[in-house]
């Protein structure tokens, strides 16, 4: 979801650092195992940050395909996610409400697909 370690620790505290995941992609690709990357969920105020570096790292690792996915809030998810994201913006609930109900995902997915293409990657929505 992000190359920013502070943000990653806040929203994905049990996930490996992005650099470690990129190293793993490189190792698998070098061994002839085809890989793909998943960027999701796309989070306002988090995913946009260092997106160029994330896609560049994916391409440099030899991965050719990227899937992107929207934020899908199931019951109880926001209550767990909101405290971690609180430091990103004062108007956080309004930002996320707009993202969930508006064209945010479509626009961000299009931006990611276009940016991915500039890095030689194929990107598409996951669902």
Model-derived regions: residue spans:
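C-terminal accessory regions of radical SAM enzymes
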Residues: 88-127
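Conserved AdoMet/S-adenosylmethionine-binding subsite of the radical SAM
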Residues: 1-104
């Amino acid at each position: 979801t992000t190359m920013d370690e502070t943000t990653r620790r806040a929203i994905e505290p049990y996930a490996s650092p992005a650099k470690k995941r990129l190293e793993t992609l490189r190792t698998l690709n070098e061994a002839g195992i085809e890989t793909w990357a998943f960027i999701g969920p796309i989070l306002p105020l988090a995913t946009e940050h260092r997106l160029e570096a994330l896609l560049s790292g994916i391409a440099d690792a030899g991965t050719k395909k990227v899937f992107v996915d929207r934020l899908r809030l199931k019951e109880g998810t926001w209550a767990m996610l909101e405290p971690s994201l609180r430091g990103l913006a004062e108007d956080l609930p309004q930002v996320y409400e707009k993202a969930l109900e508006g064209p945010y995902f479509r626009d961000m997915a299009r931006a990611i697909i276009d940016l991915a293409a500039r890095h030689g990657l194929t990107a598409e929505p996951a669902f």
